[in-house]
């Protein structure tokens, strides 16, 4: 266990009245309960920093770890946790809501300002479709069973962020969307091979450019930028895979010129 992890665990234990508990035992308990998941020490430290910074209690679900699909975790603050950090802010001076079937408006008042911070969230933008299993079966979620309550939570949390500058913390609904988007990106956008171009391939390209009376700056780099959909301003920015494709294009052009001649 790292020193930073032990120190943060000790601060949490002291704050919740468990300072007599060994830090290692506390961490083990947290890993098995509120912070359950395959979290690295760095991720665990991040969770403890958030918990201590906002005075949240993991054993009452004010903060907990939400597992993502990359063997990591997303720190989630429950509605009770959001309520705590809002009410404990020294400048908080109350809030009210206006809600109908289409939207919910939250107003938070600060003691040091003349006008309230106001945020409106819309049902058609926030509501989520039912979850689906791999077999295609729909599972009713909170947006189906309690849509107005969920929208009210959304409005309160977004308004609190603007009013007090809360950052780096999410509610469960946001965490689920983050995990879904991360998984989609990982599945649809595989990591690009960034192996640099080797000297042999570069020499072949240069030879063909001379033979075709073309240049890097005027001809090949603009073409590569268009084909690979990124701004490429120097030959050194090409990867080996991209250079091979560019070489293939030049060879095709050379063959066409030879036939035409």
Curated annotation (Swiss-Prot):
KW DNA-binding (keyword) present: yes
Q: Does the keyword Kinase apply?
A: no
Q: Where is the signal peptide?
A: none
One GO BP annotation of this record: DNA recombination
Q: Which GO terms describe its molecular function?
A: DNA binding
Pfam families (alphabetical): RecT
What InterPro entries does this protein's entry cite?
Phage_lambda_Bet, RecT_fam
Could you list this entry's UniProt keywords, alphabetically sorted: DNA recombination, DNA-binding
- What role does it play? Gene bet protein functions in general recombination and in the late, rolling-circle mode of lambda DNA replication. Has a function similar to that of E.coli recT. It is a single-stranded DNA binding protein that can promote renaturation of DNA.
Q: What is this protein called?
A: Recombination protein bet
**What organism is the protein native to?**
Escherichia phage lambda
């Amino acid at each position: 266990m790292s020193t930073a992890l032990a120190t943060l665990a000790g601060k949490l234990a002291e704050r919740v009245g468990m300072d007599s508990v060994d830090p290692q035992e506390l961490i083990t308990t947290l890993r098995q309960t509120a912070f359950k998941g395959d979290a690295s020490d760095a991720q665990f430290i991040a969770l403890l920093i958030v918990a201590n910074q906002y005075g949240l209690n993991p054993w009452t679900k004010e903060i907990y770890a939400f597992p993502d699909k990359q063997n990591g975790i997303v720190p989630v603050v429950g509605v009770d946790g959001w309520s705590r950090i809002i009410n404990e802010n020294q400048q908080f001076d109350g809030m009210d809501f206006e809600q109908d079937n289409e939207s919910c408006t939250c107003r938070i008042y600060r003691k040091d300002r003349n006008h309230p911070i106001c945020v409106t969230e819309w049902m058609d933008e926030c509501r989520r479709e039912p979850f689906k299993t791999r077999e295609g079966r729909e599972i009713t979620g909170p947006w189906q069973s309690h849509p107005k309550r969920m929208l009210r939570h959304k409005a309160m949390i977004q308004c609190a962020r603007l009013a007090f500058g809360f950052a780096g913390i999410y509610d469960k609904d946001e965490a689920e969307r983050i995990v879904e988007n991360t998984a989609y990106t990982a599945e649809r956008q595989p990591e690009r091979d960034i192996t640099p171009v080797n000297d042999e391939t570069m020499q072949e390209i240069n030879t063909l450019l001379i033979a075709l009376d073309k240049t890097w700056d005027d001809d090949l780099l603009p073409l590569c930028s268009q084909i690979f959909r990124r701004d490429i301003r120097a030959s050194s920015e090409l990867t080996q895979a991209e250079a091979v494709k560019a070489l293939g294009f030049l060879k095709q052009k050379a063959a066409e010129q030879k036939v035409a001649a």
